[in-house]
């Protein structure tokens, strides 16, 4: 292991006590002009009171047993009549000092495994096609899902589904209230 790499001790489900460290992680990982918006999203996703219909799951990666260096949220997505049809991956962050070491990939792989074992094995993401494409996300898997707002970067709207579980009919997406802000899309 090179001196720039860190011993990763665990990938685990996040707890309430992790929220302050996760917020600090996002402050370090995102550009200044995006930080407050991302912090609001994380806080709302973490709160059980902001959305009774859509649940959110959080995972963190720690280094040296205690320092949180990565975070990913996966929240449920539904149709207009509140039928769950899968998950949306947002946000994902790794502290800059630990980027390039595969931690983001480890979190995404874990989220995919979780979703594929669930009763709705599908994940949507609005992000970098080059990064998410490495995991099997593609635009075709998201073509039947209308996002809640017009996309500023349409190529970033991608999905991944278990074989045979692709959406056959168009749906209009509903997601956690934390993600229902036009400026995020």
Ranges and model annotations:
Residues 67, 81, 95-106, 118, ...:
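Conserved glycine-rich acetyl-CoA-binding loop
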Residues 117-121, 126-152:
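Conserved active-site alpha-helix within GNAT-family acetyltransferase domains
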Residues 147-185:
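C-terminal "cap" of GNAT-fold acetyltransferases
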Residues 64-66, 97, 161-166:
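Short loop segments at secondary-structure junctions
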Residues 77-89, 99:
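A conserved beta-turn-beta hairpin within the catalytic core of GNAT-like acetyltransferases
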Residues 19, 23-64, 69-73:
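Active-site rim helix/loop that mediates acceptor-substrate recognition in acyltransferases
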Residues 9-22:
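A short beta-loop-alpha structural element at the N-terminal edge
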Residues 89, 94, 100-113, 125:
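Conserved acetyl-CoA-binding loop-helix of GNAT-fold acetyltransferases
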């Amino acid at each position: 292991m090179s001196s720039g790499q860190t011993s990763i001790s665990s990938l685990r489900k996040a707890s309430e006590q992790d929220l302050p460290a996760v917020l600090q992680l996002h402050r370090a990982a995102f550009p200044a002009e995006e930080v407050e918006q991302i912090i609001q999203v994380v806080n709302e996703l973490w709160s059980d009171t902001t959305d009774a219909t859509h649940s959110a799951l959080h995972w963190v990666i720690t280094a040296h047993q205690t320092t949180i260096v990565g975070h990913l949220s996966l929240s449920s997505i539904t149709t207009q009549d509140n039928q769950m049809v899968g998950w949306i991956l947002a946000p994902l962050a790794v502290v800059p000092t630990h980027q390039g070491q595969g931690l983001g990939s480890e979190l995404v792989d874990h989220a995919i495994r979780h979703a594929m074992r669930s009763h709705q094995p599908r994940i949507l993401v609005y992000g970098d096609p080059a990064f998410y494409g490495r995991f099997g996300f593609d635009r075709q898997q998201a073509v039947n899902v209308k996002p809640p707002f017009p996309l500023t970067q349409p190529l970033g709207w991608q999905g991944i589904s278990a074989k045979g579980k692709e959406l056959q009919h168009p749906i209009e997406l509903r997601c956690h209230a934390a993600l229902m802000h036009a400026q995020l899309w």
